[in-house]
Amino acid sequence: MPERVWDRFLTEQDRSHLAMSARRRIGFGRKPALLLIDLYRWVFGDRPQPLLEAIKTWPGSCGLAAWQAISPIQTLLQAAREASIPIVHMTGLDHSGIEGWTAWREPPQPAAPSPEADDRRRRRWDIVDEVAPLPGEAVLRKSSPSAFWGTPLVGHLNYLGVDTIITCGESTSGCVRASVVDGCTYRYRMIVVDEGVFDRHEAAHAINLFDMNQKYADVVPLAEVLDYLAKWRAGQNQKPPS
């Protein structure tokens, strides 16, 4: 079995337990959608930098892990567009007078922030150009970790007949996990793209992928998702016109 990113964090007892209990895969369904979670400027900054350097100007940065995920996400996004499946981009809710869940943890803002700091805060929820939405792709804003809480996502997906949600974005241990758990609760088949999610903490990234894979989702390599989308697209093309 190929090594997984979480393997080096498992204890001997963990490994023994896994060997004794076979895990049944969730599998792909009949109608997929792609959910891109929080691919905004706040976690990328303006250029690739190591985490400890990047957070000096972009406190929410995920450092180089964010930039390393761009290419796989672009590949996934292109495949989803070619297959004509529903695509939903999630980002933060801002300029609304509503405090998000991070308000208590954020350091106090200076009474008169510098023009540069003010500009960064204005741009923080802007989805980065590399994976920007195209016209016709849904963009939803959220004020909580889950893509489902307080948003019309469920109604949108149900209307479209979606039963499978392919997920990428950040952070693995935060908004991705929260969205995956809620998606599972709503009885969607949740698929997490291994190379398409990232976190600022390596251990949190690995163990949350392990936990989601055990309980709520299938964590699968990009190649497997691309193969599924290609087959799904071919199947759609063979259907007689309605």
Which role fits each region the language model picked out?
Residues G63, W67-I70, S173-G174:
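Short, conserved micro-motifs enriched in small and acidic residues
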Residues R47-C62:
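A solvent-exposed, charged loop/short amphipathic helix patch at secondary-structure junctions
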Residues W67-P86:
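A short, N-terminal amphipathic alpha-helix
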Residues G29, P59-A66:
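Cytosolic catalytic domains that perform sulfur/thiol-centered chemistry
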Residues M1-A33, W42-L51, Q78-A83, H95-I98, ...:
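Active-site-adjacent betaalpha module
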